[in-house]
Amino acid sequence: MVTPDKNSNGIKTVDLRTPLSSEDVLALKAGDLVSISGNLITGRDKIHKYLTEQKPDKKDIPFDLSGAVLYHCGPLIKKTEDGYKIISAGPTTSMRLEMYEASVIKEYNLKGIIGKGGMGEKTLNALKENACVYFQAIGGAGVYLADRIKTVLGVWKIDEFGPAEAMWSLEAEGFPAIVTMDAHGNDIHRKIENMSSKKFSELIGQKT
C-alpha cells in the first residue's frame, strides 16, 4: 500500500506498508523518499545461495515471500526471555548478492529489496521484468535502523547459518529509505557513477 505524505520539512515521503503489490511498485520512481512499515525479511549470502541452488519448496519456508521486501542485513541479535531483540540492523553491501538476486526476485515474487550501494545490470533488468524496486538504506546507522524494528516475528535457518546469515522476519515501523533503482529502469547509482567518471575525465583532461 502506498500513501504519499509530507514531513515537517515539506519533503514528500511515500508511506509504504508491506506486502507490496505491482501497482505499489510501479507508482514509485527513483529518488522517492519512503517510510516502510510492516514485515521485512532479511537475507544475506547464505540465504541467497540456498534459495538459488537448493530451491526449497515454498511451503517449507516459514515466511510468505510473495510481495515481500527483502532486506540485505545481518542483524546483531540479543536473545531474551521472550525471544529476540534487534540491537543493530544496518544494510550490507548489495553487490555481493548480484549473482543471485535476479533469480530470487523472479522465483519468490519479491517486490522490494533494501540494501546499500545498489546492484548490477542483471538485477536492474529483473526489477523491470518483475515490478520490483531497490531501496537504499542509511549506511552506518545500524542502531538507528534497529529502533525502527519493533518486533522479531520469527527466524529460519539460524542453527544452520548462524544469526547473521539466518532469515529473520521483522516487524518494522517507519523504516526510512530512498528508491534508487526503480521498476522503470532508472538507476541513481549508475547515474552518479557515470557523472563521476565524466567529471574525472574532464579533470584529467585539464591537467594534461
Predicted segments with their positions:
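Active-site/ligand-binding-proximal alpha/beta "capping" segment
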Residues: E101-S103, V179-T208
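Feature captures the catalytic cores and cofactor-binding loops of soluble hydro-lyases/lyases
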Residues: T42-F175
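Short, structured beta-strand/loop micro-motifs enriched in basic residues and often containing a Trp
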Residues: G10-L20
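Short, well-ordered loop/turn sites that connect or cap secondary structure elements
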Residues: L28-K29
